[in-house]
């Protein structure tokens, strides 16, 4: 059985004042993690040993089924969960600890001194890895390579090269993971790592929902994530088990995303996700940027109609889509033991992907928002195989988009420089109202939203 815990309301009452919080945690955590609550912190730390023990028990079957001998812990902080990793001596021969705060470094370095061959320590901000990538691109530096120097490298089709554990509340972090797979840079250049993360419910729902939730939540990012990754929900973990504390959610009438932001605000979702081993069979690596642009461009509005949009690139292609003699191949759940009724509200099961999962009865009124991720992948595969593809204006638009990527100010705003903002789009801080620990030094000019 899992250790007993206090209810959310009782635990919150126990530490409702700043003084009580500081009294309990000041020995292990710096004041800036205790002094004020945040909307949604990008970096989070396990607050106590009881929480670490609960999480360890949730992850027991996942660790046991993994043959990986390398694990990376993000922001290990006071080391509560690190102790459980150290106890798995027969499994984890290498433990990489990445820490972004100076306060915790002396204690973490002690672990390296005790286990010099097994524990490797790096100071750096993994959650903001996209910033390091951008800085390296600007000055030819090696920040990313240095931070990941202890990570074993494997071929993409091999088994996973490491497990990554942490608590992350940063939406740009997950967008960077998508871009890393698409453009074969950064983390996934070293192999397919499996991530086990505690994350805010709105982000997980946004990434794993289907079109039944509505066009405001089911975004191009949702489609890309589900095409690229296999995902599995593990458990809900109490938000009060993590520092810094979070402000109480108070819905506003003007919020477009109230129904998502109000789901389980007192919890984080413990989930795992891994890049698909057969990704390059579904879409060749050199075609991944084209797939990315195809989805981004056509989801400028999910109400865009498929045939009129594609005929802008390949005139007269509509009849090929309407009259399709090929039989469709269905997709199946990757984890059959995962019961849909036990999944978080609005999230869906991870399924296999197919390039022959045709949307039934496509017509001139069918919208891109009607298609599921596997059906979008199938549509792109059809489009890619047409003889007109090589001479289509799509490739010129793609080339222009990639050129803009090279000059974009920073990765979270790449889409603004590459495609039109999505109709009635929700910005990153609307999907999850996060607070960045490092304020931007230069205001970024944003385009006005396009109306369709």
UniProtKB/Swiss-Prot annotation:
S-adenosyl-L-methionine binds at residues 46, 99, 125. Keywords: Methyltransferase, Mitochondrion, RNA-binding, rRNA processing, S-adenosyl-L-methionine, Transcription, Transcription regulation, Transferase, Transit peptide. Residues 408-452 are annotated as: Disordered. GO terms for molecular function: mitochondrial transcription factor activity; RNA binding; rRNA (adenine-N6,N6-)-dimethyltransferase activity. Its EC number is 2.1.1.-. GO terms for biological process: mitochondrial transcription; rRNA methylation; transcription initiation at mitochondrial promoter. Residues 421-436 have a biased composition (Acidic residues). GO terms for cellular component: mitochondrial matrix; mitochondrion. It is an enzyme of class 2 (transferase). InterPro entries: KsgA/Erm, SAM-dependent_MTases_sf. It is found in: Mitochondrion. Probable S-adenosyl-L-methionine-dependent methyltransferase which specifically dimethylates mitochondrial 12S rRNA at the conserved stem loop. Also required for basal transcription of mitochondrial DNA. Also regulates mitochondrial DNA copy number. Stimulates transcription independently of the methyltransferase activity. Belongs to the class I-like SAM-binding methyltransferase superfamily. rRNA adenine N(6)-methyltransferase family. KsgA subfamily. This is Dimethyladenosine transferase 2, mitochondrial. It comes from Drosophila melanogaster (Fruit fly). The gene is mtTFB2.
């Amino acid at each position: 059985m899992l250790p007993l815990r206090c209810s959310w309301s009782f635990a919150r009452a126990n530490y409702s004042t700043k003084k009580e919080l500081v009294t309990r945690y000041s020995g292990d955590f710096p004041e800036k993690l205790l002094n004020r609550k945040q909307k949604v912190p990008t970096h989070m730390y396990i607050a106590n040993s009881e929480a670490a023990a609960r999480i360890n028990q949730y992850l027991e079957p996942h660790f046991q089924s993994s043959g990986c001998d390398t694990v990376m812990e993000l922001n290990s902080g006071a080391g509560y969960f690190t102790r459980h990793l150290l106890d798995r001596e027969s499994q984890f021969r290498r433990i990489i600890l990445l820490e972004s705060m100076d306060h915790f470094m002396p204690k973490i370095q002690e672990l390296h001194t005790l286990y010099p061959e097994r524990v490797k320590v790096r100071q750096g901000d993994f959650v903001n890895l996209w910033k390091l990538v951008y800085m390296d691109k600007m000055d030819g530096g090696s920040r990313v390579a240095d931070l990941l120097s202890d990570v074993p490298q494997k071929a993409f089709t091999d088994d996973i090269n490491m497990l990554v554990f942490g608590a992350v509340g940063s939406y740009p972090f997950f967008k960077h993971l998508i871009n890393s797979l698409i453009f074969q840079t950064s983390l996934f250049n070293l192999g397919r790592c499996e991530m086990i993360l505690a994350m805010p419910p709105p982000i997980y729902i946004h990434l794993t929902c289907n079109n039944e939730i509505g066009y405001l939540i089911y975004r191009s990012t949702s489609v890309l994530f589900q095409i690229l990754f296999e995902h599995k929900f593990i458990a809900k973990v109490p938000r009060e088990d993590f520092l810094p504390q979070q402000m109480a959610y108070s819905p506003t009438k003007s919020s477009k995303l109230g129904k998502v932001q109000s789901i389980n605000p007192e919890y984080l979702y413990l989930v795992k996700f891994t890049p698909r081993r057969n990704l390059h069979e579904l879409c060749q690596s050199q075609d991944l940027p084209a797939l990315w642009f195809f989805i981004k461009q056509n989801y400028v509005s999910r109400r865009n109609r498929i045939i009129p949009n594609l005929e802008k690139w390949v005139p007269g292609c509509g009849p090929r889509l309407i009259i399709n003699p090929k039989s469709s191949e269905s997709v199946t759940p990757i984890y059959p033991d995962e019961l849909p009724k036990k999944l978080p509200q609005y999230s869906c099961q991870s399924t296999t992907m197919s390039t022959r999962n045709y949307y039934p009865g496509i017509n001139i009124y069918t919208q891109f928002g009607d298609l599921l991720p596997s059906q979008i992948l199938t549509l792109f595969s059809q489009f890619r195989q047409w003889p007109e593809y090589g001479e289509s204006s799509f490739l010129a638009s793609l080339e222009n988009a990639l050129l803009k990527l090279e000059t974009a100010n920073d990765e979270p705003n790449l889409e603004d420089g590459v495609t039109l903002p999505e109709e009635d789009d929700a910005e990153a801080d609307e999907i999850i109202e996060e607070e960045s620990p490092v304020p931007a030094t230069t205001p970024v000019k944003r385009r006005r939203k396009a109306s369709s």
